[in-house]
Amino acid sequence: MTSLPFPLSPEPDEASREAGRLLFAGPCDFVKGVTTMEALPPADRIEVCFAGRSNVGKSSLINALTGRKALARASNTPGRTQEINYFALGPSRYLVDLPGYGYAEAPKPIVQRWQRLLKGYLAGRQTLRRAFVLIDTRHGVKSVDEEILTLLDRSAVTFQVVMTKADKVSQAEREAVLDQVRGALKKHPAAYPELVMTSSEKGMGIETLRTIVATLG
């Protein structure tokens, strides 16, 4: 039987699920928002980052993971949220919220500044264990997503695709988008070979993603 490329991550076992629950049940506090490499906090713990197109549901996912309704705040103004936001998850982890990309309305200087910061962060952050790239299940991988995936390849940063808003499409539509995403990921050597299907609204996949973050060492 031929194995499916980029299968969905399996449901965690009880012990792994508990490790994820305990990690995210602890304190999670906003540390700082940075716009320059010099302002990054000390690289003294493991960190994971979340990247995605604007309106992909990144803030909702971070809030669902941490069980806090307003920890990460979305901006409805194009180009406004151009900081790397750091959250301390207990004493051992940073959750890093990267600025949403893909705003056509954002002024060019802001976009260029963000691109420089992102490239510097991905290339120079030795404690970064994984990037979670969020893809809207309604739309699949877009050309603007390809840009960030290629940048992650070049930076040799392992990334894992997290499908968002899975409750907004039918099962048939979901399978079609998964096929498209799997085809796109075959071209990217830095892609972790499992996908996570989520819905922040319904809680789908949240335990699985918590477990993944907890097991990264």
UniProtKB/Swiss-Prot annotation:
Family as reported in the entry's similarity comment: Belongs to the TRAFAC class TrmE-Era-EngA-EngB-Septin-like GTPase superfamily. EngB GTPase family.
EngB-type G domain span: 44-217
Alphabetical list of Pfam families matching this protein: MMR_HSR1
Record's keyword annotation contains Isomerase: no
Disulfide bonds: none
Classification via InterPro entries: G_ENGB_dom, GTP-bd, GTP-bd_ribosome_bio_YsxC, P-loop_NTPase
GO biological process, one term: division septum assembly
Annotated organism of origin: Cereibacter sphaeroides (strain ATCC 17023 / DSM 158 / JCM 6121 / CCUG 31486 / LMG 2827 / NBRC 12203 / NCIMB 8253 / ATH 2.4.1.)
HAMAP family per UniProt: GTPase_EngB
Sites where the protein binds Mg(2+): S59, T81
Name this protein carries in UniProt: Probable GTP-binding protein EngB
Gene Ontology molecular function, alphabetical: GTP binding; metal ion binding
Alphabetical keyword list: Cell cycle, Cell division, GTP-binding, Magnesium, Metal-binding, Nucleotide-binding, Septation
Obligatory cofactor(s): Mg(2+)
UniProt key word Coiled coil: no
General function of this protein: Necessary for normal cell division and for the maintenance of normal septation.
UniProt superkingdom: Bacteria
GO cellular component: cytosol
Binding positions (GTP): 52-59, 79-83, 97-100, 164-167, 198-200
